[in-house]
Amino acid sequence: RSFMEALHKATQSLEIKRNGIGADGKGYTDYETVINKLTNPSWDRVFVIYDAIKMGISLNRIHEITKIDIWYLRQYESLIALENQISKFKIDDISKELLLEAKQMGFADRQIAHMLGCLESVVHKKRKSLNINRVYKLVDTCAAEFKAKTPYYYSTFEESMQLSDGTIITENESEVTDRKKIIVLGSGPNRIGQGIEFDYCCVHGVLAASECGYETIMINCNPETVSTDFDTADKLYFEPVFWEHIYDIIQHEKPEGVIVQLGGQTALKLAEKLDRYGIKIIGTTYKSLDLAEDRGSFSTLLKENKIPYPEFGVAKTADEALVLADKLDFPILVRPSYVLGGQGMKIVINKKELEAHVVDLLQKIPNNKLLLDHYLDGAIEAEADAICDGKNVLIIGIMEHIEPCGVHSGDSNATLPPFNLGKLVMQQIIDHTNKIALSLNTVGLINIQFAIKDEVVYIIEANPRASRTVPFIAKAYKQPYVNYATKVMLGKLKVSDIDYKPKLEGFAIKQPVFSFNKFPNVNKSLGPEMKSTGESILFIDDLKDDQFYELYSRRKMYLSK
């Protein structure tokens, strides 16, 4: 339990493709860049300090520039000394004492693997064989004022103790019961693009699993959420939503399965590893989750079901993207795979812009498949949310966006129900939603986004998980849809058993909330990358409402690229 272990955990929670502080080959190596970043505070300063010390810049010089207390800089120095020491060994030669020290200082298995030149899984097996395991401690919610026992845990590494009878133990305060357990993966750090809507889904999913008789276990790392209230789940692990931490908790608790579809893209990205390690995913399987994300496979599914979609292509390099551009025609929407909130998405209108954006994306997210879609200029955007049990589909809400197609769905004002879609279009949306949900073998929630042009409904994408619009629909219709969906995932409820009685007179409008006053230098124009930090709900009796007229005027707005 040290400052550096805490700092490592904090940086592992950020989801920025870093494994902690240092030891991942992603640091700065240019002296001028490091000095400039130390002089001008930025979000990554916590990493730059490590790079500066490793480069040989003195602690006094760093203190002089940053005014950070020498004590903290010495903590960094001890980390670098440990990294240098470990890097001299191979996995077979490293001692238990040195490996334990690395874990106590917060280094992830992936970082240690980088130092030793081996795989993360090999480091994990090595420490397990040496009995170097996480122990879980109760968070003192009363700051030692009086004794309080709450099921609110964090992990750390301790030296084992030997009892008089020779038994070796470590003190673990998380006691495992013999009840059937379900783990719900949280949404991780709240940031622009992934906010409190997914936390709503996690909380209601936990409550539904509890109603079904399961011991509920929540894993999340953000203290500003309801899911991290210690009385929401039976057990709360306040840990990074990071593979190593999750796998250790799963091995400790041995749950019936893990729910990944309520925590947004953060949780969904871990589905592949859960599947590879034979851990049961509750609800929609990894195969179906991956099929929806794999543009090639998903387009084949759409073709088989005779569902139209915009022309698209997949590129791994800038050269491939430029070749694709000749086939797709501009404007083109460029986006990486497995991202939320439109991170890295951009509309490009010529080859120069396309090449520059693709090169930039591949530097930030190496080895990522880039999806290139022909952008349907002037189309109307709509989306549908549904619950499916693998046999039947219940569409819980269809929303029409007021802003033009191309504005991220999180930034759009949207009406529930739609205000301007004809019967032909609505029937296409219903038919497409039913076909896709069943073809993907969805068990739980699914969100599908559509572009409508000349009375034809095109599929933009399908996400077999909770979307940020589900809480809005549940609030507007006064129905516990996440509760229903979770019980469907657990096999305790069928879609045909759901009593669907939405209660809404008039229209509900989802309105994004922006924080541009906090970010004065940010481009305020809307586009495919999400910029809103929240949302509100507006109820109107009819379309003659003045507030609706004001919103509707935005339909002709220009998009930012």
Task: Set out the residue ranges of the language-model regions.
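ATP-dependent carboxylate activation and anion-phosphoryl transfer catalytic cores
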Residues: 1-97, 102-106, 129-134, 148, ...
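Anion (oxyanion) recognition and catalysis
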Residues: 53, 210, 275, 303, ...
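C-terminal amphipathic alpha-helical interaction region
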Residues: 111-157, 161-163, 167-171
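A generic structural signal for short coil/turn motifs at secondary-structure boundaries
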Residues: 192-195, 289, 469-473
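Conserved N-proximal alpha/beta basic substrate-recognition cap immediately N-terminal to
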Residues: 234, 244-308
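A conserved helix-loop-beta module that forms one wall/lid of the active-site cleft
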Residues: 284-345
